[in-house]
Amino acid sequence: MSIYARLLKLITLSTLCSLIILLANINMGYCNKTPKTILVLNSYHYGMQWVNNVVSGIYNEFDATGDDAIIHTEYLDSKNYSDDNYYNMLYNVYQYKYQQSPPDIIICSDDNALRFLIKYRNSLFTNIPIVFCGINNIDSYKNELENSNITGVVENFDINSTLMIAKKMQPTTKHVFVVNDFSITGQENVAVVKKAIKNFNINLDFIFSKNSSINELVAEINSLPSDSIVLLMSFNKDRLGEVFGYRRLSNKLSKETNIPIYGVWDFYVGNG
């Protein structure tokens, strides 16, 4: 990880925890010394590098501030399960666990957790402040966030600078193949990329991946013209339901394809 990536992560987590502490103090009163209870709701499963970084970062920041907080951590595991029946069961579990002892603040990471909270908040976590992180396309939530006691840190990635670097390293590039899965996060990333390239002043042909299996994706990449590059965004679940961690995905694509691959997140680097 570069020093710039580390600094950005530190700033993001510090900002996130500062928002949490501020909201908790406003919500409970500065004179109340009772330890605050914080629920951390993750969109994905324990073991994903991004999820582990977020959770450990939250714990580390609260340890560093010396704030006396009780932290509960939950995982939606939405890369593996995301149907309505599953979410209804989660609702019942969380209602059982938190109805009598609700948290004072909720931190949610990534889009699926925020969507879950917006859907069930009125009946599950009424009026509890929510702080989000890792949201890819904040424009999707404009109506829901207005006057909602929900705030947070938006995830931004510099697509144009990544493409500029790619163009310098592969100056003959004419085609960019953008890889995303068809999950909520994947399609939010598509919207972000399309918005970013509107202002990109280099003439490139952008191709967006289909709803493919991993083998179909490899075949798509290998069929690209030689003057192409891959912009790897998020591909954690393929058309057949197979789930991929970041290391496994980048290793597979680098070994089985012959097109240069670029990414906007540091956890892809060094794995292929």
Predicted features by range, described:
Residues 2-272:
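Short hydrophobic alpha-helices and adjacent helix-cap/hinge residues
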